[in-house]
Amino acid sequence: MQLLLKQRFFSWFDSFDIYDEQGNTKYVVRGELGLAHKFSIYDSHDNYVGSIAQRAFTLRYTFNFDVTNPDGSGTLQGSVIKQFTLFNTSIVVNCNRNYSLYGSWPGWDYTVYRDNQTCATFSKQLFNLTDTYVCEYANPEDELMCIVLLVAIDAIKCSQN
């Protein structure tokens, strides 16, 4: 399965539209005003799905998240923490599932692991007016975690520049 996360061009805050393989809007992520990055996630029917919020005043980029599957099948709660590394990106995910994420040196390609097995890959599409990421995943229950990780990655990249 595939998702396309595309940042909105005219937006006061970081906001994203997330499309499925057919080009239909599947989720909308809306940025909110605050001292640090904060996002709310909505499904295609504008129902609240969850939130992602950066912890302010920390040495490492840390995001707390709380999302519920739209079908009501479960909730993900935890944090995403960027580790200090020299050449590649390493992100630790503390939640009720065993996820980890590693990125390439320029920060354009990422691999997500669940229980030490590859569950998703992200790649940044270059030559677009806005930040655009493609997410490939196999298991539908990893979909919301992919969205959380992509939004956190983009916020980290935005903060570093």
Q: Would you name each region that the model predicts?
A:
Residues M1-N161:
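Intrinsically disordered, low-complexity proline/glycine-rich segments
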